[in-house]
Amino acid sequence: MKKLVYMVVDTETATLPFANEIANNDPELKKKIAIARPLVYDIGWTLMYRDGTVFEKKQFLITETFSVPSVFNTAYYASKRPLYLAMMERSEIECLPWAKVMEVFVADLAKCDFVGAFNSMFDFKKAIPFTELYIQKLYSPTYYEWEEMQYRICENIVSAPYQKKEKDFDPDHFSFRDTDYDLFDVWGLACDRLLNKKGYKEMCFEGSMLTNSGDYFKTSAETAYRYLREQYDFEEAHTALADAEIESFILSKILAKGKIDLGIDYFPFQKLGHPMDYVRTMKPSKKRERYADVIYQKMYDYCGLSEDEPPIPTKYMERTMEKMEILKDWMGI
């Protein structure tokens, strides 16, 4: 019987070269552009069997993005450039045109039964398709007209209030160059099968691993790997192949629990519930006080209450302040 083959992909991305200008160097506004218009500069993937055996791995830098300072300098991890140059010096990675890299990528896709990433929505529905479009336009005579249109779109991204737009979307497949590939999402599967447990949640409390708002438990590849490996100081490399390798390990733990479901799971972190609800069910104890304090500190910082100037009140802040009063009661303050 043929062994099933799984491809796990990770990308590191920059964005369009005028992002900083449009965002006026505001990191949050730039982040909105970077999420909506990602350009891959580092791509890595593994091929593995369901027992976790990785039998092939690849990693490439992309010439049209990594080697163009105005693009690469928009990357969140632009400071890693010397690391990549050292890797190239040691022949650990090649920098090739997108077309060449995609030839290798498509050839490996043909070997696979399933393809996925930790955040398949980002990698397969945004980063790879938008980079494919960008490269097509870059080598076309209409690039400047397209760039001008993208500039206007990015202006709208940072200025217009968020509106959910309904559009055709296939969560079960990665469509690329006229072929559909069965798609899984490691993040959603991990939240469903590995992380929605008391041990994981208590690790998050003990390590203050909640989202910045304090409303949810962190469910990143990094925190999942810490839990599964019991390596609580582990930090992701944030280079494509290294991250794909830890995501492959997480997938192996998921596969050990049975057949995977296809598709992208929207907001999978919500499956773990709210940290406040977890603390609410605890009996009064020092541990309960400690966990309540972890949530309180997250909310305090997120609302900007530690800043010299008090923030402008919002409805969200008012609701958060109400939660903080409840937390203070649980903390015995």
For the regions a language model picked out, list residue spans one by one:
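Conserved DEDDh/DEDDy metal-dependent 3′-5′ exonuclease domain
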Residues: 78-198
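Active-site catalytic microenvironments for nucleophilic, acid-base chemistry
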Residues: 130-137, 192, 227-228, 250-257
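Conserved protein kinase catalytic core
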Residues: 16-18, 191, 249
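Conserved non-catalytic scaffold segment of RNase H-like nuclease domains
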Residues: 2-128, 132
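Acidic two-metal-ion nuclease catalytic site recognized across multiple nuclease folds
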Residues: 205-216, 227, 241-333
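A structural motif
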Residues: 175-180, 195-207, 211-228
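Histidine-centered active-site/metal-ligand motif
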Residues: 237-238
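Aromatic-glycine-rich donor-binding/catalytic loop that engages nucleotide-sugar donors
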Residues: 228-234
